[in-house]
Amino acid sequence: SDGVQSSALPTRGRPEGAPVADFMPEYDKKVKSGPTWDFAENHEPMGILFGIFLTDDMWVKFVDSSNAYGRKFDSGNGRTFVDITFQEMIRFFGIVMFLGFKSVPQRRELWEVGNSMYTPIIAESMSCRRFETILRNLHWEDYTEVPPDVQRARSKVNSLWKVNGFVEYLSNKCDAAWNLHSMADIDEGGIPCKCFHSAQQYNNSKPVPRFFKIFSLNDSKYYFPKRFHAYAGKGSTTPGDNIDDDGDDNEEENDDDDVPAAYIHVEKLTDRLDLWFINLLMALDNWFNGTRVIKMLRARGIHVVGTFITNRVALSRSEEEPAYYPDFPVWYTKSGPTKGVRGDMRSFQLDEELYVTSWFDKKPVNMMHSYPTCKTTVERNAKDDDGKHIKATFERPTVVRDYVKALRGTDVDDQYTSYYRTSVATKRWPHKFYFHFVTKMFVCAFICHKYIHRLQKHHKEASLYGFSKPLVEYMCRFVYDTDSDSDPEDPVDTRTSVAPLAKGHKDAKVSNNDMRFQPKSEGHDCYHDAKAAPLMCRSRNCSKRTRNRCAACGVPLCIDLRNNTTCFYEYHSRGHYAELQ
């Protein structure tokens, strides 16, 4: 339960027992949250992904830069580079994304006929040698005419200059495609990568210790990444700064050398006018939160709530102010005389719009926020005097509830992106950015698709796998008509629409026979859906239940190599079907 109590915390500067509505920031909803485009014109998965996020100009940029690099550096020694086409680039990324669903020991096994890992959809898309050629020459930034000394100078200013344009391009796409809800959060994500690079971070407490750090502003309700940029390491410029041909930063240098590291990234992510003065609630963790960050965000009309480290707030960064705030509160600690009892809380007002709250749960929780807090109750697991587990009710500040609700957007978005991260191994660090952010665009399109169609959590279409798999297969078979008068870069979808999964046992002859008797090259592959409930096999003479599906027909069909079960073959065989009529 989470009921608000009538009595307020003893916070300086406000009346006792004031209602919550008087102090919670009221969100000024100037525009509707969610996707910004007209749903009636663009609401299908294909249109959302390729019309909003992965647009044609992105693929053209990849093709032009990769061809420029390949012509200069991938020719010679008896090898001739053949220009990469628009179709090949999309098919290449389709194979890369497909390897997020299927992991193999060595990717060449996908092309080896007779190998258990052989995958027709990949083998028919392009040859293994052509895939390796594109992988070897893949580039976003064309720096073939940039002298090596200028490249080294650029790397000293920003070590990620080769991919910053790509990251900024997709960040602008996401920014233009989504309006935030009333709550947002700023947190750090990561791109797993083990390489020799100055921007690579190491944190042994993370699931993947070595990674590139990404700072992101996410919607807390729908987990959509509104804005993001990559961290290039200490002393590097932030993305968006102007760097001339000599590698010099043209932006005016900040004279204040005492600016916190987190301050720069929060300032950069919130520098859009559409986020200002709408009482947006921003959640920050203790690495970002601080007095200077809160004052900067309040000057932009953004409310803040977050945890913080207690030894930061006491220190003053100005000679005019005292070293410590007067009547500074005593924080709860894990042990000693200041250890609290579960449910104890204190709140204190440091400035006009700067409050701190200390609450003791199993351990002390210290919050810094820009609006007053009140008192609520929350249920927690506890033990009674006999040692039995019970549900106990404790008091809790409302800012803790707000913080828990708001600080989850970036973490959930990172979790979505990690589900089907590609298994393509490469020694080149820019490729990690390319593959990671293309995967993230699939997640963004999936979030928009769920929002437009109002899909609930357990709806069968509200699955990232079910949303992404047909799109990836379409990319692997992508073709364009060069004989027509239309733009050769306009995609032509030759993939037959996927039929919905059958509910229960149905006769085989009621299925879509035009799709059913297509050759196997059209995508009639058997896959195992471990998360789906077992359904009755659609073969006429079989009554077993199975989790195996046909990728094109979408119907359950059992297949067992040990017992020589032929339901999958019989269902797709026109001759066998005719014998049964």
What positions do the PLM features span?
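Acidic, contiguous segments within the catalytic cores of piggyBac-derived transposases
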Residues: 1-581
